[in-house]
Amino acid sequence: MNCYFEEGETFTWIRDRDRKDKNLIISLRMLKEKHRSGNKQAMIAEDIRTGKKYFVKVLFCTDLEQVYVEKESKVQLYSPYVIRIYGGILDEKKRRFITLVEYIEENDLSDLVRTHGLAGSTWNEKMKVCHTIALKILYGIDHYMSMYWQDPIVHRDLKPENILASPDGETVKIIDFDWVHLHDSNVTVMLRREQKGTPGYADPRYWNSYICRKEMDIYSAGLVLYFLYTGRHHFYGNEELQRYMVGDDYAYELKDMPGIDEPLKRIIAKMIAREEERYGDIREVIADMEAYLKEIGRMPKLPELLREENTRDTIRFSYKVGDVKYSPYVKNYRFIPIEFGRKQERSQNGRMSGHILSFYRVGDEMRSVILQEDCHKIKEKERGRVREGDIYSYAGTEIEVLQIKKVR
């Protein structure tokens, strides 16, 4: 019998069970149940001390080890267009895995487009919002895919219901990484041979296979953009879905989009084409979308965007975690994740887990974003920038920046 949370119930969230520091413990009060079915539950909760709200996802499963390996709690990265996932803990006694997620008070794209409506009183105003939302979705995909160059993260369930957006397009967040393929994980490929994604949005070629490729998300994103610009699902009704599942030409041909410019249609058509004719990289999609929007004078300004123009220069970024030194090369926009409890961590401060800090490049500068609230910058040469000699501290381990050198 599953032990569901009830409204009003309290729960103590411990980020690291090996340490009992006060700032690692959050006392949560369950405010409202959002979903309950079978082995899943979703709640809105608040920090009793600060009042900060969180979204709590609960998964009940007999195979606790598999849940711990696979859960979306491992997808911890900073992006203005990807939901913040704070981490997950395993409640062995009640056989449930609990994931703490950023809480956003916005509708999903399906509800927004079909029920509440986009901001704007004219067609052009609504198209402006559509362009902004579309770009942010594409940038969000680029952000999680660019986390690792080899074997990138793949969402595998992109659809309108898994994107939160405000009516004006100011807020856009990709959510629900339940089906995610994690970097360097055979588990998410081999043990999840069952269907991946949602009928009508997942590439039918990979519907029931061991293969996991980033082109899967490009296909799904194309169908999401079709919905955004038309207000209709590309494949609708049992008959169309059955034809789509066959995986023949019908699944890869764009339907008509009345009122939409031909260049934009061509972009979306190439996103959902057969893989050999499809975009091979999300940045190719972004480049074509940006070129189209600049051509028509509709390129939105996104001040929070952490992406720069391509450059031939590379930055050699050296740092050490504890006594172990790392020297990755950083070109253009790329995250350097600092993780504990995985291959990278070699300190002797006990068992720790999670992605606690990211470094990234903007132009010729390196910057950082702290993802765990108990990670602190204890030595800083210049506020808001990363400089040689800067030191971060987490669980008694220091992360020191050794070198930032521009090379060609």
What spans do the regions from the language model cover?
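ATP-binding glycine-rich loop module of kinase domains
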Residues: G38-V67
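Conserved short submotifs of the Hanks-type protein kinase catalytic core
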Residues: K94-D108, L112
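Conserved end of the kinase activation segment
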Residues: R205-E215
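Terminal C-lobe "cap" of eukaryotic-type protein kinase domains
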Residues: R274-E277, R283-M299
